[in-house]
Amino acid sequence: MKKKVKAVMPYIRKGIINFKMGPYEAWIKIGGQVAKPHYPCLKKIVGFFHNYELPSFGISNKEARLRFIEPINRKFDAFPDYCRYEIIPMIWDCWPCLDDRMSAWLKKHDVKTAIFTSRQNAERIQKRFPDMNILVVTEGVDTSKHHEGKLLKDRKIDFLEYGRTNKLVIGESDFEGINHLCTGNLKKRLTDEELEDAMADAKTTIVLTKNYTDPAIGADVETLTQRYWENMLSRIVMVGHAPQELVDLIGYNPVIEVPIGYNSEANFRNEVKNILEHIEDYQPLVDKNREMAVKLAPWNLRMQHVKEWLVGLGYDA
């Protein structure tokens, strides 16, 4: 009998958007089945199940659960389905420093099939579990949330920083002589809608993979995150570094690459200044980037691929 695969909605903390909702909602849109979540209702209990697991009993031979998991929260992200069902984890942020913990969890729950959002992370885990079915699906976005904005020459924000801190590469001081908006320095956190509007009104932004912004965690891993798609959809000139996953997927480098090393801060400031002085020259690039992102960024495409892959493995998805 084929096991029926049902996805479970990620846990939502009050006032915080869970990025893992993107693939879950896409799974529903493509006709994937879902199961009711059973998260604990008391906050104190939530904390307990981040650190401790319930025992397994009577694993179902009729159904499997597609769960959306970060290694640091692996126990809670799969709660409590690991007790009764085969878990098919879709895994984000499986950095090298977490390999031992993630591998122990995969072994404990006899995971046979897994999905990773990073090619390099998947390759390391595959070496530890050569018989495991592993699929790599890069991060996507809901393309409808990011509009193309104004032409570059008509935008008000010269340089936008948001998301990860970039101080290890470009320092902490503002770029002088331009309208530099760093969302991390604002007294009030921008809503998603406010950030999307800011992106649609920004000329340039910095994009870096985690191995540059947080090398202690990122190690040598560079991966395609949703931020690249969001910038491409918003037609912002991206300055920094593109992960090879993105270049391979779309067939060209959409980022203005800047040498990162001893003189990174000066390199970035000079490059941004040069781009702003010739901003209209970059309109064709950002137009192409948006066109490519509209075509290749949607979560629906990725989850359809996941669904077909699972069917090919013998699941009822």
Which positions does each model-derived feature cover?
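Nucleotide-sugar donor-binding catalytic core of glycosyltransferases
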Residues: 2-64, 69-79, 89-252, 299-303, ...
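CheY-like receiver
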Residues: 198, 271-274, 309
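Acidic, glycine-centered active-site loop in nucleotide-sugar glycosyltransferases
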Residues: 248-259, 270
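C-terminal "capping" alpha-helix adjacent to the active site of nucleotide-linked donor transferases
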Residues: 262-280
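A charged, aromatic-enriched C-terminal amphipathic alpha-helix characteristic of glycosyltransferases
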Residues: 276-311
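Generic C-terminal helix-cap and adjacent flexible tail
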Residues: 311-317
